[in-house]
């Protein structure tokens, strides 16, 4: 008889692009270059629901917990 204790594996993906069909961007929230759009940062951030990093991409932190 072989005894195998339960193993737990924690997988963390700190930066994972959101998948909304094409390009991983939320609908209506495409990246806007700072040279083209010179609005205040507060106005640009208020236009999208998800937080935007410095590159204009929307990211979601996803953690997975697997138990075997």
Curated annotation (Swiss-Prot):
Biological processes, Gene Ontology terms: axon regeneration; regulation of neuron differentiation; regulation of transforming growth factor beta receptor signaling pathway
The source's superkingdom equals Eukaryota
Pfam family name, one: Alveol-reg_P311
The root-end lineage is: Eukaryota, Metazoa, Chordata, Craniata, Vertebrata
Q: Which InterPro entries match?
A: Neuronal_3.1
> What's the name of its gene?
NREP
**What is this protein identified as?**
Neuronal regeneration-related protein
């Amino acid at each position: 008889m072989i005894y195998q204790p339960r193993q737990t594996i924690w997988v963390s993906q700190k930066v994972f692009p959101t998948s909304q069909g094409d390009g991983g961007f939320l609908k209506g929230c495409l990246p806007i270059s700072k040279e083209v759009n010179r609005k205040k940062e507060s106005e640009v951030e208020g236009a999208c629901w998800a937080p935007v990093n410095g590159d204009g991409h929307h990211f979601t932190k996803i953690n997975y917990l697997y138990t075997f």
